[in-house]
Amino acid sequence: MIDIENLSKVFDARTLWRDVNFTVKSGEMLALVGPSGSGKSTLLNCLGLLEKPSGGKIHYEGSDITRFGRRDILRFRRDTLGYLFQQYALIENATVDENLEVVTRLQRSLRGTAATAVAEALDRVGLAGRGREKICHLSGGEQQRVALARLVVQQPDLVLADEPTGALDDANASMVVDILHEMSRGGCAVVIATHDAGVRDRCDAVFAVDESALVTLHDAR
């Protein structure tokens, strides 16, 4: 799926990480751990083409996506990538349904009708019947579940999740991890930046960003 080769990132003359090498395949869930400021989120952003690495390559289906132009980047994000952001990245003055319908309009391979896909996704995250509520009226945990439902509708090949349980109670955190795990077992590749031991324990491999290097803590693949 994704093969990272000798990736490096320098920010304000500081090397966040260098010579990063790892692979994540379909059906695998990987965790990136490390202290705040170590560059976990930046590494996710590079994988998602939100930032450019300072060096190295990211191979996807035979192409080095770090060399993509704007059109290819947009296509990659639309057709391949799903991102679970720390701040949810939802349209706050729109309803839950309207947020998910943005995804259905972009999906060319959506199974069934858009309305059915949205309803099924909301049911899966425990928000059935809440589609007409505005995002700004929801709690943080509920907003994270809407963002998760967006991934369920999108059905991406690659999911990048940045501290997806960081601000959640135990029940919401468990639901998020369960669904990410289900998505990986369904064939999606999942990479998670996390401090949560419960998340790490569910992953097939765990890598630590430590003193500018990537260290393998666990790999059961």
Q: What feature does the model see in each segment?
A:
Residues 134-138, 142:
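Conserved ABC ATPase signature
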Residues 133, 153-154, 186:
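Conserved signature/switch motifs of ABC ATPase nucleotide-binding domains
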Residues 56-64:
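Conserved ABC transporter NBD signature motif
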Residues 159-162:
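Catalytic Walker B motif of ABC-type/P-loop ATPase nucleotide-binding domains
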Residues 48:
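Helix-to-loop junction immediately C-terminal to a conserved catalytic motif
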Residues 2, 17-19, 76:
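Conserved structural motif at the start of ABC-family nucleotide-binding domains
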